[in-house]
Amino acid sequence: MTKVKVAINGYGTIGKRVADAVALQDDMEIIGIAKTRPNFETVMAKDKGFNVYTLADRVGAMEKEGIEVSGTVEEMIKAADVVVDCTPGKVGATNKDLYEKAGIKAIWQGGEAHTLTGCSFNAETNYDEALGKDFVRVVSCNTTGLCRVLSPLDKEFGVKKARVTLLRRAADPGDIKTGPINAIVPNPIKLPSHHGPDVKTVIPNIDIATTAVKLPTTLMHLHTINLELEKECTAEDVESVLAEQSRVRFVGQGITSTAEIMELAKDLGRSRGDMWENCIWNESITMYEGELYFFQAIHQESDVIPENIDAIRAMMELESDASRSIEITNKTMGI
């Protein structure tokens, strides 16, 4: 089998995880990663055997720190079939001209606007839309988490109205620059938040409004979900539908917080302690006065990683069937 050659432009929180996931696949391979600074992540990439590329004016800085560079970002892109852009939000959009000139397919992350690609992706929801596409955007961690539950519930019962409050972590664990440290911040203060419109880029028909708050924690996001459904159903009916979703994990057994979910991920032996699935407290699934309520937790560093793998497979037309691609990705990653 000829493997698809994948380049990773940006090797931070998402990029390094996507690189590791690609390396697990039988139908794709990493031809290089791009970093702009000679930090510990760059050294780790070399230790893993990845070819390191950088900007032309950064080659000297890399070599000064003893990091062998395989070439420039432009050279990496020319050698690839598809590039996964994991550069910081709003930076990735500036790379589109570079990819277009190279005639290469590209995937961006949720920090970029939907208009950049015209195709926002979630594997379980709209895999077919990305088949053969040149440019695709994998939606953010929060939007991914919402699509994973709203899509199957909409198909089964019809979602008449969705109202979601997102309790967002303030920063990733390794981020020392972002806050708040000792405050609760309505973000944004003017409602609704951007998450609802972002969900609609994947599920256009859904009526959804979202509000969001930033909290002084680094571990996960928490969603409080309230749905008005078109068909009558019980909490048990909802639980049965969600139980069939391969990227949804029910939590209980004494787990009452995001801290304990992260501990569970470590106990499962997950790489970096990642939790790729939505974590739903199935005990929270409740029908109250005809409306559905439940809580779910989203690991912001990792839930989009399997989605990037499925996006590659769809764009390169390695697999036309969404369920088959999801099955392959889940098996290789241990989901």
From Swiss-Prot:
Assembly: Homotetramer.
Gene Ontology CC entries for this record: cytoplasm
Entries under Pfam families matching the protein: DapB_N (PF01113), Gp_dh_C (PF02800)
Origin species: Methanococcoides burtonii (strain DSM 6242 / NBRC 107633 / OCM 468 / ACE-M)
Molecular-function annotations in GO: 4-hydroxy-tetrahydrodipicolinate reductase; glyceraldehyde-3-phosphate dehydrogenase (NAD+) (phosphorylating) activity; glyceraldehyde-3-phosphate dehydrogenase (NADP+) (phosphorylating) activity; NAD binding; NADP binding
Keyword NADP annotated: yes
Binding site for NAD(+): 13-14, 111, 169, 300
Catalytic activity field: D-glyceraldehyde 3-phosphate + phosphate + NADP(+) = (2R)-3-phospho-glyceroyl phosphate + NADPH + H(+); D-glyceraldehyde 3-phosphate + phosphate + NAD(+) = (2R)-3-phospho-glyceroyl phosphate + NADH + H(+)
Family recorded in the similarity comment: Belongs to the glyceraldehyde-3-phosphate dehydrogenase family.
Gene3D superfamilies: Dihydrodipicolinate Reductase, domain 2 (3.30.360.10), NAD(P)-binding Rossmann-like Domain (3.40.50.720)
Compartments (UniProt record): Cytoplasm
Keywords: Cytoplasm, Glycolysis, NAD, NADP, Oxidoreductase
Top-rank lineage group of the source organism: Archaea
Protein name as catalogued: Glyceraldehyde-3-phosphate dehydrogenase
Enzyme class: oxidoreductase
